Amino acid sequence: MPHSNTLIVPSTNPFDDPSSIKNGLNNLTSSELVNQMKKESLAASVKTPSTPPKECSHLKKGVKLSHLKGNARALRDPSKHLCFICTTEKIKREDYELTLCANCGYLFCCNHESDHSRKHFEKNKKHCVFVNIITLKCHCYSCDADIVIFDKKNLVVRDVQQFICSNLVSSLTKAPNVLKSNSSHFKKEKKSKHSSGKSSKKYKVISPGLKNLGATCFFNSTLQVLCACEALHDVISPFQYSHSSVIVRKLTKSPESSLLSAFIKFLETFYKSDGTISVYRPTTFFGEFRRLHPQFSESVQQDAHELLRLLLDDLISEEFRVLRFNLNSVSRSLQLSPCLTDDEQLSKSLTSFKQVNVTDASLSPNSHNTSDNEQNNEDYVSVSSLVGSETEDITYSKELSQSSDSSQHQHDSFLPANSSPLAASSTKSLPSSELLDSSSDKGQQVFKGQHEVAGTNSFEDPNSHFNVSNSSNHEEASPKKEVLKSPQFQRRSLDILRLGELSSDDMMLDKATMDEFSSSLVIKSIFTGRLTSVVMCQSCNEITNTPEPIQDLSIPIHYPSSRVSRRHRFHRALRSRFSRSPKKSSVKIVVDNANDDTDQAPTTNSSSLNENLLGGHASENDKSLKQSPFQKLTRRLSDLSVNSSGQISKQDFDNSNSIFSESSLSSPIIEEPKTLIDCLKNFTHVEELSGENMFACENCCNQPNEVGSPAKGGLTSDNDKYSFNNSVYRNAYKRMLLDDPLPPVFIIHLKRFFQEISHDGYANPKKISDFIEFEQELDLNEFVMPHLRASSSFRYRLFGVIVHSGTLNYGHYVAYVLSHKFLDLSAPSTNSKDFRSEAGIPERRWLYISDNIVRESSWDEVSKVEAYMLFYERV
């Protein structure tokens, strides 16, 4: 760096000269070199000068620590140690020093004729302070002098130097195939409780990083956590980590699924990594996923949680198609009847299917060098089904399928449209809209033809039409035909295919057979759990359970205070009063006279009760003269609910008492949760459904004197627009609890992105950067259904964390994983692969992964990060 005035004595530190640094690499290890660089450079910066130093007046405007933290990624990645101007102008230079602008955080070269650091200063006069990232010398171009720290002056320079030391990953000091952060050498890390072994052991990281394909850090971090999942490893790799886990079946590549095959091939390559290749390019897998979801384009920041949800849904859907295809192949190999209504034959084919090994010989084991088009250039695919003593090779040619009946639905790389030739020849393809219309004669003829033909009882592709046939005779199956014609059944069947679910009522098969079929979905059994919504009506005390499958639990970490909510409601009501939009139609509601104790029919006061139950408007005179009629109505409905409450059985009382206990009803919500347990308590907190969120109770409707009754307890009238004959609006309590089965892998998503409603009604998207404390072990016994708490333990162990740093519009994803991908350098080299044929160690240690940067971490570092998604595995 050129200097006109030097305020300190020239240092004799050999690290001031970059050439001396390179010459000394042979005599020092990387850790010793980094430590010595830090100590001597910091010592040189505070060395007593020969003349009294001057305090630089430009530090206040020239140093912006907040801007430096935003560009810390350039220091952590050695591949980004390039001059900003040289990169922009595509100039290639070697052996030049880099300086960090203390204002914007960009790197600029300084030891050649161009001197881009000075050019940057001449263009932006406030950007005058630069720090050499190797020697840590600070220079001010406005003063044209070096800046030194002396007698509590210029202390902000020390902050910049410490920032560089804690984030710099120099290409001169990194070990082969392993990228380590200098900060791991400056601090003595606490050992994780999952890392067993003596402290004298030395480990080498062999876990590969992933190449950033253009703002794909969200994709790389999610993949790294999935690669660290032991349950997923045990169903793909022939070598198990957890011998106590029950494996449904091995997950293998199949020519009928492009995304699933690319996913399995990537994991197989990752598991076989031994450190020879430090960075992989997930081009094939990302290309297959982007083909299904074009919105995930390169160079555009995306959400890692959205990616995970779509990825798991696609993998489960493709696995379901492969399962159906292989089941039909086994059925044909056993020469079974195309009609699979016999439960014993179907159960036999399911048992035989588990013995089938489906392989794809065209898939190369080297996935990191495979192009995107390799999987789409196959002329035919072959499925070998080995069942008992019979061996049959069934070959399906794509050319034959294209030359077959033109009405048959075509597939590129998934299942054939009709699993039975008989069904294919007797069924014409119709659009889903025509097929789901129960009033369409064409749709009824299709189902009638399928029913009369002894064909398949099969599910079609969700993108195609849905065919269900029955093998029983016409007289016996007439009630079932009505079910098949039902649009509710047809829509439910299509939803089942999209979600990968199976129902014994929809399939009309034995429940045990369908449970066995559904349990064969490997990815679904690993990641899918169940969340139950429990609602108790305050009038009849009836409990309604509504379960739903979940693959992750999204819990909020921000709860606005009641004061802010009242303010927002006031402004919303004020805007609606002066709104020019047409008012909603009012609803006439019949209630009892509050001052009349007799059983006479209630009167309707349209002037005071002309209020929309779903948020309509009352007259302006009522608003100005007295309290809102809607508030009176809500309080009146609550009184009616209490007065009309009936008796409850002992069993229902025990269930309601355990779920809606007195402590859960009285415990307030935690407005500022600090820990993960606080967030889970808020999520499972008892919520009161009242006002606009009243519960439509069907049990109250079935009791006497309810709907349209002139007696007490009548809530709505049969003539009302929003009245339904099968339900009555009641106040109720609601609680969300986890239900059986709990998944082996439990994913928690912290909602850090939300929209804040301002006082003027506009939604401002924001990110919550609050720290949420989480533990390595999580006990979910408090958050499951009461009947499960005494049966088994629900303890989980943390194995992966995804962190998002930055703002809502710009940021970066990194991952912390608990990995086996280490080599014990203190052990003999022959023992590195004795644990399994995959390189690694039996115990697991924490890793920090940022795209292609992989370094060892510790629980002390992981526990302090700003977690976005937490991955737990059941113990």
From Swiss-Prot:
Protein's recorded name: Probable ubiquitin carboxyl-terminal hydrolase 7
Active site: C217 (nucleophile), H812 (proton acceptor)
EC code: 3.4.19.12
Organism: Schizosaccharomyces pombe (strain 972 / ATCC 24843)
Reaction catalyzed: Thiol-dependent hydrolysis of ester, thioester, amide, peptide and isopeptide bonds formed by the C-terminal Gly of ubiquitin (a 76-residue protein attached to proteins as an intracellular targeting signal)
Gene: ubp7
Region (Disordered): 396-486, 575-628
Pfam families: UCH, zf-UBP
Biased composition, class Low complexity, residue ranges: 401-438
